[in-house]
Design a protein with these regions (language model features):
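A short beta-strand-turn-helix
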Residues: 2-19, 60
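Conserved Rossmann-like nucleotide-binding pocket used by diverse enzymes
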Residues: 5, 25, 52
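Short pre-active-site segment immediately N-terminal to redox-active cysteine/selenocysteine motifs
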Residues: 17-18, 24-28, 70
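Conserved helix-turn-beta segment immediately C-terminal to the redox Cys motif
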Residues: 17-19, 34-54
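Conserved redox-active cysteine motifs that mediate thiol-disulfide chemistry
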Residues: 24-38
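Adenine-nucleotide cofactor-binding loop residues
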Residues: 57
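Structural micro-motif
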Residues: 60, 66-75
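Non-catalytic, surface beta->alpha helical segment in thiol-disulfide oxidoreductase systems
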Residues: 78-103
Length: 103
């Protein structure tokens, strides 16, 4: 999975031709570390949605722009807009169900 930065966010996420799930996370966040391998599995199993990571400690302006107040916080972007919010660590089946329309 690609790591997005403040500088790459517009190109990698907002201007993407495909839907993009952004996993807003931090290294110190236990639930974030729990959901990371699940996202990697989903990313490797399909090609319809891109999954990227945005570190809120390294890029606090992204967290502020998208009002990230708790993590893990995942947002699906399509056409430059947030179309789905998923907050908290969830099992793979629940996450896949939340993303079903894009998988």
């Amino acid at each position: 999975m690609k790591n997005v930065t403040t500088d790459s966010f517009e190109t990698d996420v907002l201007k993407s031709d495909k839907p993009v799930l952004v996993d807003f996370w931090a290294a110190w966040c236990g639930p974030c570390r729990a959901v990371a391998p699940i996202l990697e599995e989903i990313d490797g199993e399909q090609e319809k949605i891109d999954i990227v990571k945005g570190n809120v400690d390294e890029h606090p302006e992204l967290a502020q722009r998208y009002q990230i107040t708790s993590i893990p916080n995942m947002k699906v972007f399509q056409g430059g807009e947030v179309v789905k919010d998923i907050i908290g660590a969830t099992p793979k089946a629940a996450l896949a169900a939340d993303l079903a329309q894009w998988l």
